[in-house]
Regions:
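Conserved class I S-adenosyl-L-methionine
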Residues: 1-41, 57, 61, 162-164, ...
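C-terminal alpha-helical "lid/dimerization" subdomain adjacent to the S-adenosyl-L-methionine
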Residues: 4, 147-200
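Short glycine-centered segments of the SAM/dcSAM-binding site in methyltransferase folds
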Residues: 47, 71, 143-145
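Class I SAM-dependent methyltransferase SAM/SAH-binding core
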Residues: 49-104
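Helix-to-beta-strand junctions that scaffold the AdoMet/dcAdoMet cofactor pocket
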Residues: 67, 124-126, 140-142
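A short acidic, Gly/Pro-enriched loop at the edge of an enzyme's catalytic core
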Residues: 103-115
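A short SAM/SAH-binding and catalytic strip from SAM-dependent methyltransferases
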Residues: 114-127
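A short glycine-rich, Lys/Arg-flanked "PGG" loop and its adjoining helix->strand segment in the class I
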Residues: 130-142
Length: 210
């Protein structure tokens, strides 16, 4: 399969991804991801999907929630990210990695009890965002929740410049729409949408109930 420019970029970026996110969120110890994982309801036998799973930092926390039985599935289109992820997670039987486009998920309808996406949704372009939200609705069980964690506007000038550069890669119109109309966009798909600020104050979590 021919690789897109974005896949090539993320394959190369996989070696620096965790440090980049820590710098953006002022969260070197992963407190925001820990906070997110603790918000996700988990019962024995549940299946949780982590979209744009990257190098697996959130997966490792989510799998602890299902130690009594269940499965955490990580999906990413970047083989480089998944390679780093696999090195971290291959010893855990309740973690499964899948190389796929989140805009076309290879799972049956109503497969998951919760879905997460950490610091990645903003990077999906235009139609991919719309299709991804449609796919989330398709594979999420009725009444269950999609948790989307993203950076709030950074205070440090250098980090803010990097944040704007990241948004610019999405296209100006898409970036402005997300920043100004995030809740409105999500409410087109979900029954309820709530915004929570993480304890670090640098990230936000959108809690979207189907």
């Amino acid at each position: 399969m021919k690789k897109s420019i974005r896949q090539i970029y993320y394959n190369a970026f996989s070696r620096f991804y965790d440090r980049f996110v820590a710098l953006h969120s002022s969260d070197a110890q992963g407190a925001a991801r820990e906070y997110l994982s603790n918000m996700v309801p988990a019962s024995e036998g549940d299946r949780i999907l982590d979209m744009c799973t990257g190098t697996g930092s959130l997966l490792l926390r989510l799998r602890k929630r299902l130690e009594r039985g269940g499965l955490v599935v990580g999906v990413d289109f970047s083989r480089g990210m998944l390679h780093v992820n696999q090195k971290r997670t291959e010893t855990y039987e309740n973690i499964c990695l899948v190389e796929a486009d989140v805009a076309s998920l290879p799972f049956p309808a109503q497969s998951f009890d919760a879905i997460t996406c950490s610091h990645a949704f903003y990077e999906l372009k235009g139609e991919s965002q719309e299709r991804s939200l449609q796919e989330i609705l398709r594979v999420l069980k009725p009444g269950k929740v999609f948790f989307m964690m993203e950076h709030d506007l950074p205070e440090k000038p250098l980090v803010r410049a990097m944040f704007y550069l990241r948004l610019a890669s999405m296209g100006a119109k898409s970036a402005i729409n997300i920043l100004r109309h995030e809740k409105m966009m999500l409410r087109r798909y979900f029954r309820s949408v709530e915004k929570v600020i993480t304890p670090t104050g640098r990230s936000k979590i959108m809690i979207c109930r189907k």
